């Protein structure tokens, strides 16, 4: 029975430019058995093409169709939601701009003209950018969309601030929750990947990642099998703290090759999914 595997990248497949031991072998193992493997990252500072090149360089076979990042999800969402004449003001890096432009999203540098504000990870984030976004929201009732909810991103030197920092800044000044957060664990992202890319039923899909509040939460809410790996952000202690329970907990992705549920033709459940 064909299965779909949705792998996170940072903290799951690699850390920075260092492949996590057993990752390439695990992906090969699954691909050679006819399973559909895709990669889904919330990181918004690199393009999908960048990820194809990086994974290929690290010895993992993949192509553009099997790479999803939060920029791509955001662009697809906006393409469905925006009228052709509407404009977006973007706080983010070049990779986010590129993805939005590929989907035909019109971008303005003048926040006063914006119908939508897009927040992404921005390592040149300034008070002025925050002020412009706030003014567009206050004066134009612009909708606020964030690429992803992650507070931090794992790196070899430890976690660093991610898009969640920008969300916090905007919510701090506006006093409201922003309108939409894309990437994991959004319903839109899940539908896009499961129904339109993998084209499988949720129960045929496994999401593999190192974050409880994004990877595992997404799987639990939308009926996917969940595999938490302990090579990134989350720990056994985090599970107790958050109350988010993965279906499987593995030291790293290489242990997937020993799971009878994966290697056997018939999948047997080893625990209940938690809603």
Could you say what each language-model-derived stretch is?
Residues 1-7, 15-21, 25-33, 45, ...:
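Asp-based, Mg2+/Mn2+-dependent phosphohydrolase catalytic module
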Residues 42:
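A metal-dependent hydrolase metal-coordination microenvironment
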